[in-house]
Design a protein with these regions (language model features):
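Compositionally biased linear targeting/interaction segments
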Residues: 5-173, 179-186, 326
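Outer-membrane beta-barrel pore proteins
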Residues: 117-119, 146-148, 199-207, 255
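Beta-stranded membrane pore/translocator domains
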Residues: 133-139, 147-153, 157-159, 164, ...
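Outer membrane beta-barrel
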Residues: 162-240, 319-324, 433-435, 442-456
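Residues within well-ordered beta-strands of beta-sheet-rich folds
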Residues: 179, 228-230, 239-241, 253, ...
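Hydrophobic, small-residue-rich alpha-helical packing segments that form membrane-like cores
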Residues: 221-225, 238-257, 261, 267
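Exposed, low-structure sequence patches enriched in small/polar residues
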Residues: 272-273, 283-284, 288-517
Length: 517
């Protein structure tokens, strides 16, 4: 049964985002990616009035899923609940529950009462102070958001002494969106143009194939700056943009009930590139591919990726992929599927309810390497508590073998939350960490112990952070970290932490604050 309310677990947002994007773990997220989806979560889209281009631009849906949603609304009327959404072909209970963060299901009467001319001002400020082995530093991030109804949004940010802005207009009829200032561009599978959001090289099975978001407003440090717009008519979507550095981009996509087909082109200072992409669902099978060419300084480079899913049943599927990159393929804003120049790879994956596993073998001349991961997730109920657990093993073989085992468990029952993790890594030497965290939904305390004597055996663990900031610190040395996280979900948040080192390394501390007006 689909849960009627969101869990009290304060990490649910990150967990939902990991599942929707098909990532291996929360450590695979990036600050710019989290910032983008936090902004989207603050102003959820109405799934009943969102266009095809708007649904695709979230990056959560395949063209087949979007077609299923639009066909359902056309045949049956508005979707009135997330339980109803879960019954649509290609969605399911888990995905519908995760989408609660980013969408709303407004009934027609409520839609008619809402004014699209309401002025919505919002100002956010994030500040941090750090003291460590490096000279002390003060970091600030101030963000301001002004909106006029649902159509006009202005974003402004100052990171330390670097200002950024972005103004977005949602148009009518054929003009879907116009952006002036900072923007991100994510097309096809990312071979030619995929800026702003970085992900790890190896994904969960769902992440073998990416869902592009097109052009979106952004004030992150990795944004492009210029003018961009998205146009749509019937089943076609056209995205065009021009940056201050002279990068011209264009993407044309054509969508059917079963798939999508697109062409992407770019030009910058004498260099040019083009790619073709397709994704189609036929019965139990989903096929996707993209091929790209890039010409610069008299040299032509190429890259390609393709794969196949077999969707046996809900939460039961297998998949495979191949990908390759030439030595001379060097697009600046590309995310070339985790490959080095001249490298190619093949991979397999399976997702079978609570168990999933992926692995790939990479080739580069005479060099051979491989990597993979296996996960087992489980849930249980004990009284009023919802208990979730995960066992995870990841491995990598290059010049030597590296293994990492991770076991984590959390229990939440409003208003309480408890969690912990044990993580062991075997590379050149042994290393490990463990932590316990407990508290209320608005206040959480964590104590973490780590022992990683060599830098090559360092460990990473997600640390809960204030909105507008995201951190996956590397733990190196031997020490104990204590942190406290307190928040008012709608107004403010404070995080304070202190790390004691049991060696000659200097202790360090950090304080972060977030205020929203």
């Amino acid at each position: 049964m689909l849960s009627a309310v969101l869990s009290a677990n304060p990490g649910d947002f990150s967990a939902s985002l990991v599942r929707l994007l098909g990532l291996e773990s929360v450590e695979s997220l990036s600050e710019t990616l989290v910032e983008h989806y936090e902004q989207m979560s603050a102003h959820p889209l109405d799934i009943n009035t969102s266009s095809r281009a708007e649904l695709l631009s979230t990056g959560f849906f395949t063209p087949f899923q979007v077609a299923s949603i639009l066909d359902y609304i056309s045949d049956n009327g508005p979707i009135l609940s997330f339980f109803e959404l879960s019954g649509i072909i290609g969605i399911g209970e888990q995905m519908a529950d995760d989408l609660r963060w980013f969408f709303r299901c407004d009934p027609p009467r409520r839609q008619s009462l809402k004014s699209n001319r309401a002025y919505r001002p919002e100002v956010k400020f994030t500040g941090s102070i750090r003291e460590s082995v490096r000279p002390s530093g003060v970091g600030t991030l101030a963000k301001c958001e002004l909106a006029y109804g649902e159509r006009v949004t202005a974003l402004m940010a100052i990171r330390d002494d670097r200002p950024a802005f972005s103004v977005s207009l949602s148009g009518r009829r054929h003009l879907e969106k116009l952006v002036v200032g900072g923007f991100n561009a994510r097309f096809a599978q990312g071979l030619l143009l995929w800026n702003g959001f970085s992900m790890s090289g190896l994904y969960d099975l769902a992440g073998f194939s990416r869902n592009p978001t097109g052009l979106s407003s952004s004030v992150s440090s990795a944004s492009l700056v210029g003018v961009a717009s998205t146009w749509s008519w019937k089943r076609s979507v056209l995205g065009i943009g021009l940056t201050e550095k002279g990068l011209a981009i264009m993407n044309y996509g054509f969508y059917t009930a079963r798939g999508s087909y697109s062409l992407t082109a770019l030009y910058e200072n004498g260099a040019c590139g083009a790619s073709a992409d397709m994704k189609a669902t036929l019965g139990l099978f989903t096929l996707w591919s993209e091929g790209a060419l890039y010409y610069k300084d008299g040299v032509l480079g190429s890259a390609a990726v393709g794969g196949l899913y077999c969707n046996i049943a809900y939460r039961k599927r297998v998949g495979a992929f191949v990908k390759a990159r030439s030595e001379s393929f060097s697009v600046q804003n590309s995310n070339v599927t985790g490959l080095k120049p001249g490298q190619s790879a093949v991979g397999l994956g399976v997702d079978w309810q609570v168990f999933s596993a992926v692995g790939e073998v990479l080739f580069r001349g005479q060099e051979l390497s491989a990597r993979g991961l296996e996960k087992w997730n489980w849930t249980a109920e004990w009284g009023e508590f919802q208990i979730e657990g995960e066992l995870r093993h990841s491995w990598k073989y290059a010049s030597g073998m590296k293994n990492e085992m991770r076991a984590s468990v959390s229990a939440s029952g409003a208003p309480f939350y408890y969690g912990g993790r044990v993580q062991v890594h075997k590379g050149k030497d042994w290393s490990g960490l463990c932590y316990l965290e407990a508290g209320l939904r608005q206040a959480l305390c964590r104590v973490l112990y780590f022992d990683a004597r060599k830098w090559d055996d360092r460990l990473y663990a997600y640390a809960r952070d204030v909105p507008g900031s995201f951190s996956v610190p590397a733990y190196y040395g031997k020490g104990l970290e204590c942190s406290l996280f307190v928040r008012d979900p709608k107004r403010w948040a404070i995080k304070a932490g202190y790390t004691f080192y049991f060696s000659d390394k200097a202790d360090k501390w950090e304080v972060k604050a977030y205020v929203r007006f």
